[in-house]
């Protein structure tokens, strides 16, 4: 269920939007006009459902700002697939595949999401080679990242996978050695296929070894070299 705080149509938002700028080209006025007239920006609060598994996909969805988690309900339990940082497209394989959302996406922070008419987006792909190429690159990078996470989950121990998560938050998501965990320890355990007790124990060990400092949900990485070694060898 959506808990939408506001919906608005922005006449000039598309000119400077990263959705356009990331394609490394200046779209023609006709294309910009088509985007301006066929999109809606929705603000979601932390915890709101952006995409729900099993529902019909009718729009291209672009995360303009904020953080979200991608998760799927399997035969036995719900599995967190990955954490998504803006700017990023959400659910493109579903939108251009069988049109039924194969996973859910939930906001981990307040987030602005752009819903773009799928037919207009298809036209942009056909008319703009550079834009189409940027979308292909996005999909390829996402797939390679999924392969890497899958290999790590199955071949690394919990200690190494937890180090990966902390390094990912530090280097990719927050770009800082001091950050607040956007997910609970239970969610971290789900993300790395471990138990909450193991996550809690490993975090305590990392604090005891002065590799990290933890105050509530705030993490400060004190010894990144050691954390990287744990990631590589554990």
Where are these regions (language model features)?
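Cyclic-nucleotide recognition modules
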Residues: 31-32, 82-140, 144
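Polybasic "coupling" helices that flank or enter modular domains
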Residues: 126-193
